[in-house]
A protein has these predicted regions:
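N-terminal pro-sequences and low-complexity stem/linker regions of secreted or lumenal proteins
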Residues: 397-809
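Predominantly soluble domains enriched in secretory-pathway, periplasmic, or organellar proteins
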Residues: 5, 10-11, 16, 21-420
Length: 809
């Protein structure tokens, strides 16, 4: 009987592992597990939408819903019949972003035309969109305008257009289609609404934490009202006496009395009571009787439901689970309509782009391709529309429990052994005093460690095996091999925010697809624009507030100046940032000199961030360091770094954490979020494979616990710390670097299609070069010009922690 039970357990474990590897539902449940550890269990009926639906609008007669899909790939406008819950029309649009408005007769649909700097006006007849007219605000990108939210005054034939690139409001005469006036707003804005008397237009300043009031008669800003952090969507009740403001960076909704111009209540929409960012409140809807408020929490994958019958005394009713990243919500005919920006699941893309094909331009970040068979990650996660019947109290209770089950935040984590060097909670003592955090660029696990037999790798996908990366391999073999680690980001635009803040806000998430689709946009990420910052800053800000000493080498600093205020006087002058003309081994030499200087004075900071970016490579651009040499140089820099630190007198109190900011530039047979990561310390276990599921946020949480820092967001607070990687018994044996197995000075000399293509790439900053195309070039440089790169895989599922072997195995 005992043997039978053991057999059944083994079969069960095996089945769970098999099912866990399939995209979609977790075996035995209706849930989908995402790589970040959060889950989905959407309810209701659904319709397929396009790439990244950012806004849905209900017609005045409540018969139609319009959708604007604003992702990296093909952008479209869709019409949906409310009664039949069917899509009646879909039109492709070159560029679009957020703005969407029916006129009062519902026979015209106004659509913001993105960085073409136009408004398209579609006639609407019998559920169809006809050929649009155009209102031009100015010349197309690179002229900075970029229309966003729209407010239409049919009575006076005026269209108010909020713009996000030149921080303005355009007042347009619909009769002449000319701009009557341009009003400076001062900060990035997203949308505007006006009340029934049309006297005041309320505009949310995404980048200024306030709503400004425009007198429509004067055409001037006359007042402002402070809100919480990063206000985005606005909603007025029918009387116009209360304005609801979603605060994307604060997990909240501000309710403003429009008569007194005061915030009379702030509703917290987070799933659990917390001040930590991470819910990303970004859309609002009221029930027909205006007693119930529905709030979309994009990063909690749910709606928060509140009774607002008595303003000032609003009551939480519960939560409704949605799809992935809900961006818009409307209420119509006892149904709740929710646009899920990333759909219901991630997925593999076995028919990924083939850059050698003449019909494929997805790798160029041009947004769309005529070959519908292609599956490119930038536009892979198609949106969906959830249609949920207004739930009764008992049903809402069930939905609420589902949301709690999907949410790892605030769940009790199992405590490590008392002797584990990683503290269980803030304030506990760790023998580790110095943390070194190395950030690299864009590689997947299989690309680098796919040849390691004891890990879950695919050697066929390994571009940079042990000969090219002997130090990465040695460190993974001698310490811990992490074969179930996933980055939280998709690309570098959000990758450095996730790596340094455990969060990418809604501005970042909603704008990078435009840039990556080659549709214009500033691309001011990586600390270059304040609106991209998390509310409470990055990890250096937390160090500063806690009195933890810190220093940055190249990350959010360019060698001359600090990109963010917290790094002023806290970065290494002369340490290069993103510049492929400079080797990573040169960067390491600069760090060694600076480290030795600080060590001699006993001034080595407790927290150190180091940027080694050259594994990104320059492709096959003639005259540049070849991809193999660039990755080998990066590998040697890591080896020299660990060698120098491990021979120093502070090694016994040190830990090094190494990861990629994202994993976009390569294939992986498990999931393209999977990436190589290393943990090196005297307290790291030796010669072990650790298959616990870890994430970028989990790395950050571990470092925070060592340094005595609080979590920065709901994501690192919910993440699993790296307890399984550490031991209470230190091994102080220093590391000696492995010599490079390839010539580090090899340059690209071949004149072929890949070289010609590489000449068009810009490497001025992260992800300037198209990621898929660059990856194809790198693949060919290693495998040969005629080699075809396997398609990368993207999945919502992750491999659950492998069943641990018994101690006596």
């Amino acid at each position: 009987m005992k043997k039978l039970c053991i057999l059944l357990l083994l079969i069960s474990a095996s089945s769970n592992l098999i099912f866990a590897q399939l995209p979609g539902k977790v075996h035995g449940s209706s849930r989908v597990l995402l790589p970040n550890g959060w889950s989905l269990s959407p309810v209701g009926r659904s319709l397929p939408l396009g790439d990244l639906p950012l806004n849905i609008q209900l017609s005045h007669d409540k018969k139609k819903i319009a959708v604007t899909n604003n992702g990296q790939s093909k952008q479209t406008i869709q019409l949906i019949d409310v009664k039949t819950e069917r899509i009646t029309d879909e039109k492709e649009i070159g560029k679009s972003w957020y703005g969407l408005q029916f006129n009062e007769k519902d026979n015209k649909l106004y659509v913001s035309g993105g960085n073409d700097n136009i408004i398209l006006v579609y006639p609407v007849e019998k559920g169809k969109l006809l050929e649009p007219d155009t209102i031009r605000l100015g010349k197309a990108w690179p002229v900075k305008i970029s229309p966003a939210g729209l407010a239409l005054d049919d009575l006076n034939q005026v269209l108010y257009v909020v713009t996000k690139e030149d921080n303005s409001l355009y007042i347009v005469d619909l009769t002449t289609r000319k701009t009557l006036k341009k009003v400076a707003l001062g900060r990035v804005a997203i949308t505007g609404v006006y009340g029934p008397d049309r006297k005041i237009l309320y505009i949310s300043l995404w980048g200024a934490n306030k709503v400004v009031l425009l007198d429509t008669k004067l055409g001037q800003i006359t007042d402002s009202i402070a809100t919480q952090y990063a206000p985005n969507e606005l909603l007025l009740n029918k009387k116009g006496d209360y304005l609801f403001v979603a605060n994307g960076g604060d997990n909240s909704v501000s309710i403003i009395n429009t008569q007194t111009k005061k915030v009379v209540e702030v509703i917290s929409s987070a799933v659990h009571p917390t001040q930590l960012t991470g819910s990303t409140t970004n859309a609002l809807a009221l029930s027909d009787n205006e007693q119930t408020l529905y709030i979309a929490n994009a990063d909690n994958n749910c709606l928060a439901v509140f009774n607002v019958a008595k303003i000032g005394e609003s009551v939480s009713l519960g939560f409704i689970p949605t799809g992935w990243y809900p961006t818009s919500v409307k209420y119509c005919k006892n149904r709740i309509w929710v646009a899920n920006g990333k759909g219901f699941t991630s997925m593999a893309n076995p028919k990924g782009p083939q850059p050698i094909s003449k019909v494929d331009n997805s790798e160029l970040h041009e947004g769309s391709t005529p070959d519908k068979r292609l599956q490119y990650i930038g536009g892979l996660f198609k949106g969906t529309l959830s249609i949920v019947d207004d739930p009764k109290e008992t049903v809402l209770k069930e939905y609420t429990q589902m949301v709690y089950s999907n949410t790892p935040f605030n769940k009790q984590q199992q405590a490590p052994s008392a002797s584990n060097p990683i503290p269980f909670k803030k304030g506990d003592v760790s023998p580790i005093k110095y943390v070194f955090y190395i950030i690299k660029e864009n590689r997947t696990y299989d690309q680098v460690l796919g040849d390691v037999k004891k890990g879950n790798g695919d050697p066929k996908l390994c571009l940079f095996p042990e000969k090219v990366t002997p130090n990465i391999h040695a460190l993974a073999e001698e310490y811990v091999l992490l074969d179930n680690f996933y980055v939280d980001a998709e690309v570098s635009a959000d990758g450095h925010n996730w790596s340094m803040g455990a969060y990418a806000n809604d501005y970042v998430e909603k704008t990078w697809p435009t840039q990556y689709g080659k549709r214009g946009g500033a691309g001011d990420y990586g600390g270059n624009r304040k609106i991209t910052y998390p509310r409470d800053g990055f990890i250096w800000d937390y160090c500063k507030r806690a009195g933890v000493s810190y220093r940055s080498y190249g990350e959010f600093a360019n060698g001359k100046t600090a990109v963010i205020a917290a790094l002023k006087d806290h970065f290494c002058v002369g340490f290069p940032s993103f510049d492929f003309e400079i080797k990573d081994t040169t960067r390491c030499a600069i760090w060694i000199k600076d480290f030795d200087r600080l060590l001699a004075k006993d001034e080595v900071p407790q927290f150190n961030t180091i940027k080694f970016p050259n594994d990104h490579t320059s492709g096959q651009k003639r005259g540049q360091i070849s991809p193999l040499a660039a990755v080998a140089d990066n590998d040697l820099a890591v080896g020299l770094f660990i060698e120098h630190l491990s021979h120093s007198r502070i090694w016994k109190e040190s830990a090094v954490f190494i990861l990629e900011d994202d994993a976009q530039n390569g294939p992986d047979h498990v999931d393209a979020h999977r990436s190589p990561a290393l943990v090196i310390s005297p307290y790291t276990k030796r010669n072990q494979v650790v298959s616990t599921m870890y994430s970028t946020s989990g790395f950050l949480r571990t470092m925070e616990l060592i340094l005595g820092l609080p979590p920065m967001s709901q994501y690192d607070a919910a993440a699993i710390p790296l307890y399984d990687c550490f031991t209470a018994t230190p091994d102080y044996t220093p590391y000696n670097h492995r010599k490079a197995g390839v010539n580090l000075d090899t340059r690209n000399v071949a004149l072929n299609k890949s070289a010609e293509l590489s000449e068009t790439f810009s490497f001025a900053k992260e992800d300037e070069a198209p990621d898929l195309q660059l990856n194809q070039v790198v693949w060919k440089s290693v495998k040969g010009e005629d080699a075809v790169m396997p398609a990368p895989r993207r999945s919502a599922f992750v491999i659950a922690e492998k069943k641990k072997k018994d101690d006596d195995d």
